[in-house]
Structure formats: structure tokens, C-alpha cells
Amino acid sequence: RRYPGSAQTWTLIAAAALCLVLVTGTMVTGSGPHSGDAGVGMEGRLQMDTRVLAYVHSVCMYLYLIATIITTVLLRNSGAPDDAKRTAYVLIAMILVQWAIGVIQFRMGVPRWTIPAHIAMSSVVVAFSGFLFAHGKRRLPTLV
């Protein structure tokens, strides 16, 4: 183990919250104007209120951010390895970039050009979440 169990527990809590973010984000996309073939029209889309789903999605994102911040504080206060702390800091920065893109999307009425950016950043956030979890255990011997 490379950092305390409490930080690993919060990493798992953050991962669960991230799953909720991803599911609700998919639902927001599925209910919106850019969710599929333009010829299908809104009848072929998820028949839920996009605005309400966006609010649920944002609440899940805030829970994820809070869990990630708690994890980061635990890592910093426990003397965890520097690579784990750096990953946590980068992850928080990436979550905030993703948040900003989402707010821009919401306030601008989901312009088409924002969707690839939001999806790409989602991939970055998921990857760094995995990196942070992986820093919790040393799987290979250190060479230095």
C-alpha cells in the first residue's frame, strides 16, 4: 500500500460518484438536441427533461469533486508519495476544466462544438481517476 486506507476508501467513493456523473451525463446527452440522427427528430430521443437531468448531473459532479478533494487532502496530510499527490492535483484541475465546459454548454444552449470537448475531457477525468486509484498500490518494483 502506498497511501492510507482512508484515502483509498475515498478514492473508491469518488469513483462511485464518477459513475453517477457518467450515467447522468449520458442521459443529458440522450435527451438533448444532439443525441442522434437529425432525421429522427426529438421523438427518438430520451423523453426526459434535459434541464432537470443537467441539474442532477451537476449535483453528481459536485459530489465527485468533493470526494476527490477529500481524497487529495487525505493524501497531502498522510505523507503519500508525491506522484499520487500530483495526480490528485491534476485530477482536480481537470474536473474544474470539465465543469467549466459543462457550464458553458448549459448556458449557451448546448452548441454542437462543445460536445466533443466535453466528451474528450470526460475521458481525461476518467483516466486520471484511474491513475489516482492505481497509485494506491505498488504493482511493480521500483527501479530507483
Provide a role label for each language-model segment:
Residues R1-V144:
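Polytopic transmembrane helical bundles with strong interfacial aromatic enrichment
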